[in-house]
């Protein structure tokens, strides 16, 4: 027995998706990818569905064709509290990404993220403090401290919001970019993990009856992209309660699994058989021969983030909109796969690259490794870092520029490579940082020369209270002065809504002296050209042809793709005009 009415499940899930995509209506036949969804939003969908009493998985959200199918897969969920004794308070085991930060070196106090949101016209100093206090007391990791015994979280009430909040009067006007930048840097300099100063907030008060702005500056060790979505949602709910004269704490949903508990689950997983079985795979990925040629090796003593070169480019909504919605759906791929296909095509034309390239990818890290874990509302740094090896040989053909068949070959390779990664890459960090034997083997390998991070969609359409202010935006990877670069070239991509639709932004950084601006600009502009070529190719070939690509087809009963030779697959693709 299913135990749940499909129509009711459809109603719930349509409402969840409409809220997350900030659109008036979603119907049962609408598909998650067609709406512009990605794995980060999928985690939010799962969390919102849980709060409404439905159990679905991230895989369901990403692979099922529409809301009707997702509703049919949903199961009723019994509400449960945290496991006994898990109040989130106490020692926190260092997770793989926390070990990675320690190895990287530099001033961890200033490794921060920030986000600037609009504040409502009725906000006062007292109500701002009440809203902020509700966040501090709800989310354990905002109260973390690192002392001589290691990391530990403190009880609710240990940090007073008034001590974290600064008011800046702007006297009837919006804060300028210079004012916001100056205050964010000053807030960054006040952060101290040893002193337990993890959060700083700056309220730009335009005066009575006028909307203002709030800059939240948080040490990166306790926050990531999904955490920010949790925090901004809680800001809005806490304010609604305060404005109505209610206690804000009661307006915030409970957190099912604490970060402290998650750190224990990761340690147990690192010692398990599933993780040990991945060692040959990861040793194969990091084998020699996939480096990026630079003028010299990356030097942590001089290649610091504050000395890096920077380049910011934007892909207009006319291309980014279809690329991340209808085209991704038509290609049978998610946004990350489409973006990395374009990057592979660009890398194949980039002088420093050979026939293979090692790229370090970032994942959201909230993977399904334990049945008890519900991380949809947990604030913390869950990011997984893992290397991926892309084959570039043959992808430099000229036809790719015009959306020719090389684009299909690139997508096939990238999609199959990414889908072959065990457990979305979480095992690499467990082995690299929590396994004393395999960790040494992986540490000895040459690191990836390129880092890629897709942060997904940030904020809604803008303009509303507690929503991202595009004029000031956010920075979700902001190492402070003296932090060594992790890669010779790095790119962070994210999507912001505009009046014309979604715009893809790409922030590039490089170690000056290893590469120069002309080299990086050539790669950055080539990437955007190849993304445009994928739009052209998808329009040219149509959805029926793309859906037959090998990695887009789930195995039928009694038949697996392992039984089909590559020559046969190539013949099939050629018959459909893909090769």
Which stretches of residues belong to each language-model region?
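Regions immediately C-terminal to embedded phosphopantetheine-bearing carrier domains
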Residues: 1-109, 126, 130, 257-258, ...
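Short amphipathic alpha-helices and their capping loops
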Residues: 75-107, 129-175, 197, 237, ...
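A short, small/polar-residue-rich loop/turn motif at beta-strand boundaries
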Residues: 121-137, 152-195, 233, 279, ...
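Active-site-proximal acidic secondary-structure segment that organizes catalysis
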Residues: 44, 51, 133, 199-260, ...
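His-Asp-centered acyl/peptidyl-transfer active-site segments
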Residues: 105-112, 129, 140-141, 193, ...
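Extended, hydrophobic beta-loop-alpha segments that form or line the acyl/peptidyl-thioester binding
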Residues: 57-59, 139, 143, 232-233, ...
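Acyl activation and transfer enzymes in specialized metabolism, enriched
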Residues: 10, 120-143, 216-233, 309-354, ...
């Amino acid at each position: 027995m299913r135990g749940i009415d499909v129509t009711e499940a459809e109603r719930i899930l349509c409402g969840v998706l409409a809220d997350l995509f900030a659109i008036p209506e979603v119907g049962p036949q609408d598909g998650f990818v067609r709406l512009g969804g990605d794995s980060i939003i999928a985690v939010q969908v799962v969390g919102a569905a849980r709060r409404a009493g439905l159990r679905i998985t991230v895989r369901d959200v990403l692979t099922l064709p529409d809301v009707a199918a997702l509703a049919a897969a949903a199961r009723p969920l019994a509400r449960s509290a945290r496991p006994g004794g898990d109040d989130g308070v106490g020692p926190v085991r260092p997770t793989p990404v926390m070990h990675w930060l320690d190895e990287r070196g530099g001033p961890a106090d200033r490794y921060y993220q920030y986000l600037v949101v609009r504040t409502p016209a009725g906000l006062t100093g007292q109500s701002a403090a009440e809203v902020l206090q509700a966040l501090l007391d709800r989310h354990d990791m905002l109260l973390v401290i690192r002392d001589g015994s290691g990391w530990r979280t403190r009880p609710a009430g240990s940090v007073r919001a008034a001590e974290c909040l600064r008011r800046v009067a702007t006297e009837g006007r919006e804060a300028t970019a210079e004012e916001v930048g100056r205050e964010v840097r000053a807030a960054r300099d006040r952060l101290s993990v040893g002193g337990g100063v993890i959060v700083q907030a700056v309220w730009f008060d335009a005066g009575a009856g006028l909307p203002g702005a709030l800059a939240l500056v948080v040490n990166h060790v306790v926050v990531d992209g999904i955490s920010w979505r949790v925090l901004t949602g809680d800001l809005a709910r806490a304010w609604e309660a305060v404005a109505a004269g209610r206690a804000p704490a009661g307006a915030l949903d409970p957190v099912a699994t604490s970060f402290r508990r998650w750190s224990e689950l990761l340690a147990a997983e690192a010692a398990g058989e599933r993780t040990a079985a991945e060692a040959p795979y990861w040793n194969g990925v990091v084998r020699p021969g996939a480096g990026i040629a630079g003028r010299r090796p990356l030097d942590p003593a001089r290649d610091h983030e504050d000395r890096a070169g920077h380049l910011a480019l934007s892909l207009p909504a006319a291309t980014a909109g279809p690329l991340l919605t209808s085209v991704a759906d038509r290609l049978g791929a998610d946004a990350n796969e489409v973006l990395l296909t374009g990057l592979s095509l660009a890398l194949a034309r980039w002088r420093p690259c050979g026939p293979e390239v090692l790229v370090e990818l970032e994942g959201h890290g909230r993977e399904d490794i334990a049945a008890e874990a519900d991380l949809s509302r947990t604030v913390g740094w869950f990011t997984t870092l893992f290397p991926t090896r892309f084959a570039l040989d043959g992808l430099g053909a000229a036809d790719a520029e015009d959306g020719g068949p090389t684009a299909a070959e690139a997508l096939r390779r990238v999609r199959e490579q990414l889908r072959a990664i065990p457990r979305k890459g979480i095992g690499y960090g467990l082995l690299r940082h929590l396994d004393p034997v395999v960790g040494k083997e992986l540490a000895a390998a040459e690191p990836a020369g390129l880092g890629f991070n897709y942060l997904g969609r940030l904020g809604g359409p803008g303009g509303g209270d507690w929503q991202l202010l595009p004029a000031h935006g956010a920075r979700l990877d902001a190492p402070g002065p003296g932090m060594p670069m992790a890669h010779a070239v790095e790119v962070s991509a994210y999507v912001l809504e505009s009046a014309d639709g979604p715009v893809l932004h790409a922030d590039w950084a490089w170690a000056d002296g290893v590469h120069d601006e002309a080299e990086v600009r050539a790669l950055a502009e080539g990437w955007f050209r190849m993304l445009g070529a994928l739009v052209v190719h998808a329009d040219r070939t149509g959805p029926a042809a793309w859906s037959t690509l090998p990695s887009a087809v789930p195995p039928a009963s009694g038949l697996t793709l392992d039984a089909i030779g590559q020559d046969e697959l190539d013949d099939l693709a050629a018959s459909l005009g893909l090769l």
